[in-house]
């Protein structure tokens, strides 16, 4: 009976989302205040009904109700309770329910926190989010229902959650990523609502920007956590594969980054209006594209859900309706959008325009590199491969001028400026950059490569000019220590995010150029050397868990003869799913990671091991956290506080 309650809640959600999609928009069109006033209670009703469905699915997993097919496929009596509950979103049906529940969360947040906005604007925004909800609730209810019964027969035990997903990082990675994906629906809804009314002004940008920042922060955290999981869980030391599904999360991140910067121009100068609206449509459209790639069945990926063609066709049709309808409205109304003025050749606006051009170039590279092999294969033209070297080289070319813009842009004034005002600090910074670009790789790693030099240069120029801009802004009217305390959260957020980019670039440059990998065969007492580090194999002991059996290898590491760390790498065999998994062991720090992965046992009682030395790799994720923190500070800037908006 409990599973049926989930079905009833989904059916109720469909009815409420249909009403939300119709009545508020009709009321806004006809100027009917009573119909517009229904938007908020209907949104809260949708959230309540989907919360009931979500809670029911949690309960079914908690009690291992094997009369439900989705529970059978993803749970087992031996599975620990925390993995049992996270299995709710461990496969296709449950992750779709998570998606639409988070959409209801975002919709409710808009309803709750936008009481200062005009009633018509709120009605249109919530109505558009209702339309989005209708499509996804229909999809879940009729093609991907997690409450489908196994009657008349049901097993006494389940098949178990995929062992790759039995990890703490994967408990939080999908919700964070989906919060980012779904969050861009708010920016999309604001953009479409503004297109419908033709009211595209600085107020619209100010309303949209904190919601866009929130979505971008969640997406950043989701990508960072997913990358970290891939690094320590998959056992080969990589952190980004340029996998099509990884790329499908990176593309909306690039579009969202461009949107945040474009919104700042629209808000402050009234420029880039049409372009900003297009970016809002693009960001959410790319989120939907990612959903299609994961669930269409056309991908073979660690991230892809097994799915039948019917589901893929439904998502494709939904994609065409949403994106096609949005672009048709944009084509019809876009010509009516008028920006206040054009940017001068040398101004903050022109810097941000170049920023957007480079971000869109990067997006096109990822888009074409991801989809061309898929399209080529689907057309029956055979298989082609576009691998990591292509993406790495293209991003090196794009990121070099982007880093220079990231440093110079904040120093340039709005509307009009002269380069002579910042010539001296820029020339000095470039001089230091050129020296440091060669010196840092040489002194830190005794080796120089082209990409490590360029990476070091990018890091140095961003950091130096960010610190100079901080000093200039703080001492504009007062002493440094007085002025720095008066800087806005938005300014601190911008600086932290830019420094985060510098840190990530530094981590990528050094880890990719100077990592050392050794595949070794070791018996107890054997040692292997990587640079100044000695890895000594101390043996393997049994390491059994609640749903797996395995072995744990001890590797003692010393540096220049002095003990450094003891690592314990595991090899697990999951008895239900009959899958083997590697659990790497890592000792890390700011300057290097030492990484050990245990392989198979060989004939002569020796073991295969993979050893890594990875310099500065943690800077990649630390930089990502800095970016997210920067976005968070910008989101909570005083001018985005809702009482401030009300006064304005």
Regions of interest found by a model, annotated:
Residues 30-39, 113-125, 197-208, 267-275, ...:
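Membrane-interface helix-boundary motifs at transmembrane edges
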Residues 518-610:
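Soluble non-transmembrane domains of integral membrane proteins
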Residues 175, 182-192, 204-262, 275, ...:
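Extended, hydrophobic alpha-helical segments in both membrane/secreted and soluble proteins
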Residues 1-9, 32-36, 59-93, 145-174, ...:
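Membrane-interface interhelical loops and short amphipathic "cap" helices
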Residues 1-34, 50-52, 66, 244-254, ...:
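Contiguous transmembrane helix-bundle modules in multi-pass membrane proteins
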Residues 39-48, 128-129, 203-225, 270-287, ...:
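Interfacial and helix-entry/exit segments of alpha-helical transmembrane bundles
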Residues 11-22, 95-227, 235:
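A conserved hydrophobic secondary-structure block that centers on an alpha-helix together
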Residues 50-73, 77-79, 86-111, 139-149, ...:
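Transmembrane-helix bundle segments that line or gate the permeation/cavity pathway
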């Amino acid at each position: 009976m409990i599973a049926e309650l989930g079905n009833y809640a989904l059916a109720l959600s469909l009815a409420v989302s249909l009403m939300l999609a119709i009545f508020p928009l009709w009321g806004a069109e006809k100027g009917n205040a009573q119909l517009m006033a229904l938007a908020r209670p209907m949104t809260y009703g949708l959230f309540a009904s989907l919360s009931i469905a979500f809670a029911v699915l949690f309960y079914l997993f908690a009690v291992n109700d094997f009369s439900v097919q989705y529970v059978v496929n993803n749970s087992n009596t031996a599975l620990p309770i925390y993995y049992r509950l996270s299995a709710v979103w461990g496969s296709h049906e449950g992750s779709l329910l998570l998606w639409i529940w988070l959409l209801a969360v975002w919709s409710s947040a808009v309803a709750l926190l936008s009481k200062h906005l005009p009633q018509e604007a709120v009605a249109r925004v919530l109505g558009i989010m209702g339309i989005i909800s209708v499509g996804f609730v229909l999809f879940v209810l009729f093609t991907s229902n997690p409450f489908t019964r196994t009657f008349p027969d049901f097993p006494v035990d389940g098949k178990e959650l995929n062992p790759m997903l039995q990890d703490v990082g994967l408990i939080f990675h999908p919700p964070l990523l989906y919060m980012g994906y779904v969050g861009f629906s708010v920016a999309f809804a604001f953009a479409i609502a503004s297109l419908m009314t033709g009211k595209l002004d600085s107020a619209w940008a100010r309303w949209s920007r904190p919601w866009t920042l929130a979505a971008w922060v969640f997406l950043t955290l989701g990508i960072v956590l997913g990358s970290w999981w891939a690094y320590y869980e998959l056992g080969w030391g990589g952190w980004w594969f340029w996998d099509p599904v990884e790329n499908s999360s990176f593309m909306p991140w690039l579009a969202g980054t461009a949107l945040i910067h474009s919104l700042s121009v629209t808000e402050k100068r009234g420029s880039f209006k049409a372009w900003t609206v297009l970016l809002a449509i693009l960001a959410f459209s790319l989120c939907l594209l990612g959903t299609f790639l994961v669930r269409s069945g056309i991908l073979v990926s660690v991230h892809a859900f097994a799915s039948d063609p019917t589901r893929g066709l439904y998502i494709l049709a939904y994609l065409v309706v949403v994106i096609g309808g949005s672009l048709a409205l944009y084509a019809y109304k876009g010509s009516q959008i008028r920006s206040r003025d054009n940017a001068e050749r040398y101004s903050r606006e022109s810097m941000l325009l170049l920023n957007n051009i480079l971000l869109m170039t990067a997006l096109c590279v990822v888009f074409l590199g991801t989809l061309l092999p898929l399209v080529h294969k689907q057309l029956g033209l055979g298989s082609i491969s576009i691998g990591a070297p292509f993406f790495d080289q293209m991003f090196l070319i794009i990121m070099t001028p982007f880093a220079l813009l990231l440093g110079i842009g904040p120093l340039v004034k709005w509307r009009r400026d002269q380069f002579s005002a910042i010539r001296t600090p820029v020339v000095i910074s470039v001089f230091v950059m050129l020296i440091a670009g060669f010196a840092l790789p040489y002194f830190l790693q005794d080796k120089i490569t082209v990409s490590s030099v360029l990476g070091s240069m990018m890091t140095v120029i961003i950091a130096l000019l960010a610190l100079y801009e901080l000093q200039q802004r703080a001492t504009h009217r007062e002493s440094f220590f007085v002025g720095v305390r008066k800087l806005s959260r938005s300014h601190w957020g911008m600086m932290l995010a830019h420094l985060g980019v510098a840190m990530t670039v530094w981590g990528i440059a050094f880890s990719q150029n100077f990592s050392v990998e050794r595949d070794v065969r070791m018996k107890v007492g054997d040692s292997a050397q990587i640079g100044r580090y000695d890895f000594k194999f101390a043996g393997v002991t049994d390491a059994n868990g609640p749903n797996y059996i395995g072995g744990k290898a001890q590797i003692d590491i010393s540096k220049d003869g002095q003990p450094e760390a003891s690592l314990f790498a595991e090899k697990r065999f999951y008895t239900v799913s009959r899958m083997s998994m590697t659990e790497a062991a890592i000792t890390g720090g700011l300057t290097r990671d030492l990484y050990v992965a245990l392989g198979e046992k060989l004939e002569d009682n020796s073991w295969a091991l993979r050893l890594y030395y990875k310099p500065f790799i943690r800077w990649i994720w630390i930089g990502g956290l800095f970016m997210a923190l920067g976005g968070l500070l910008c989101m909570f800037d005083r001018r985005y506080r809702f009482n401030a908006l009300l006064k304005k």
